[in-house]
Amino acid sequence: MNAARPSTEHCDLLVIGSGAGALSAAVTAAHLGLKVIVVEKDPQYGGTTAWSGGWMWVPRNPLAIEAGLVERIEKPLSYLRRELGEKFDESRVLAFLKNGPRMVEFFRRHTALQFIDGNVIPDFHGHTIDAALGGRSICAAPFDARQLGDRLHDLKPPLQETTLWGMGIASGAELRHFLNALHKPASFWHVTKLVLRHGRDLLVHRRGTRLVNGNALIGGLAQSAFALGVQIRVNSPAVRLLQSEGRVTGAVVQTPNGEVSIQARCGVVLASGGFPHDPARKQQLLPHAPTGHEHWSAGNRGNTGDGLRLGESAGGVVAGDLVQAAALAPVSLVLRPDGSVAHFPHLIERAKPGLIA
């Protein structure tokens, strides 16, 4: 007996993945009037972004300019030229530097996603010529997840080990309040209010609704997507791309109810994350990891390189000449009460004096 032919659906744009890149593409396309479907293989949307700090490096962004931190484009261009060395591509870098601020303004003006500034956060390599002492970073502002309604519980919660009883703590000023809660009355009162609200959220919603960091970034994007009619489907991995006459026309998606063929008139966006949990790809691209099992990643466990393989199936080529194919940080393995093992990233610790890693 022949296997049943997948049912067929149609849209203008199909987005594979549901992190910040995926949802940014979905929201932008929907704002321009396209019918968009987002498919996510995990049971919850948000990807690694939902676990992240939610920070973005966007020189000359509107928040910095509003604070009086104005610089010519040549400054960050020079910084990146020195940082990237022989991999510097001026056309790409200029495209990023020119369109990054436009992106921030678009989301501020047209979506639920808002931002807080990082005007006192310096560039990573402060001794590089044309590095800045601040004004080049932004972060998602706290977001009230009650706006998500019945899709709240489809949002991936923050990594448990980075929270206080499941409550996310925003980096920057809020984190300083928590560190000073037993020393400064203002900090104690600030923390008390947040803890009381979180307790109420647990009673009413079974999870926190004041989202911060990467969770806020996903919350704001998801709310905007839903408001624009974007469909976000979880438990729906893309298994292969559809092609016709040399172009990608859609994808076959495995859903809880069987395979669905989604035809996308304008194309497919591959935004399903990297390859931190793909040993074969790590073995190929990380010379110091000869078996592909030398590193533990704090990235989403669903990041197994699916998008790269899908791209290769359509003739794409994954660059193999990168100076460094991974962003590395110390990770601890934390045994949870249920027997599972969490991968805890020591991101803050990287900046502490005396760290050896």
Residue ranges of predicted features:
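Residues forming the flavin
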Residues: 1-76, 115-357
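Short glycine/proline- and acidic residue-enriched helix-loop micro-motifs
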Residues: 81-90, 201-208
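Eukaryotic low-complexity, mixed-charge intrinsically disordered interaction/regulatory segments enriched
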Residues: 62-64, 68, 76-88, 95
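Charged/polar, solvent-exposed surface patches and flexible loops
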Residues: 78-82, 95-98, 109, 177, ...
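Long, well-ordered early-domain segments
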Residues: 83-123
